[in-house]
A protein has these predicted regions:
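Short hydrophobic alpha-helical runs that function as membrane-insertion/retention elements
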Residues: 129-132
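Amidase signature
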Residues: 1-120, 124, 134-169
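Short, hydrophobic/proline-enriched secondary-structure or compact coil segments at domain edges
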Residues: 171-173
Length: 173
């Protein structure tokens, strides 16, 4: 990208864990009723990925709670925009794009998609985005870091899915 004349700088996601938790609350605010009713009407079974994210056992939120969640969403969007403005002041240019992974792994094994955080935060922000393939996994280059210690239970599940070769890696822009 730099060879093409673009300025590239590191971007640290702002309050990422907070955003992931917030979007999950929004996704599951009806306790999974909408998605499971739609699946029932279609005759399609719920895939494990959906049941993890939209579990019918999740508590439904009432209208006032939902409004409060959306106020938190709006506040987070405003804070994120402020982070953009601060970075633009720092670099002296407008930010044209954030280029980030869409998934933590190169490909997803059937029924093993566990972490929605990368794409979901972009959705929470209401950003326009596109996913593009950028390279391929290569077992000679993309080696497992044996001494890696997972940051959480979810991170351990994701790390267990990271051994691929020949599959595409994608970025969300």
């Amino acid at each position: 990208m730099m060879k093409a004349g673009h300025t590239v700088f590191p971007w640290t996601p702002y309050k990422h864990d907070f955003a992931v938790d917030l979007i999950y609350r929004i996704y599951a605010s009806d306790g999974g009723t909408d998605i499971f009713n739609t699946l029932k009407e279609s005759g399609e079974p719920a895939i494990p990925n959906f049941t993890d994210l939209f579990s019918p056992s999740l508590p439904k939120v009432d209208m006032n709670e939902l409004w409060a969640v959306h106020l938190k969403k709006w506040a987070y969007q405003s804070e994120y925009l402020e982070q953009f403005r601060l970075m633009e002041e720092k670099i002296g240019k407008e930010i044209d794009a954030i280029i980030a992974p869409i998934t933590p792994t190169a490909a997803i094994r059937h029924n093993q998609f566990k972490y929605y955080g990368y794409g979901s935060v972009i959705n929470l922000l209401d950003f326009t985005s596109i996913v593009v393939p950028v390279t391929f996994a290569d077992k000679a280059v993309d080696k497992k870091v044996e001494e890696y210690k997972p940051l959480s239970e979810m991170d351990a599940k994701v790390q267990a899915e990271c051994e691929y070769s020949g599959t595409s890696r994608r970025a969300k822009c």
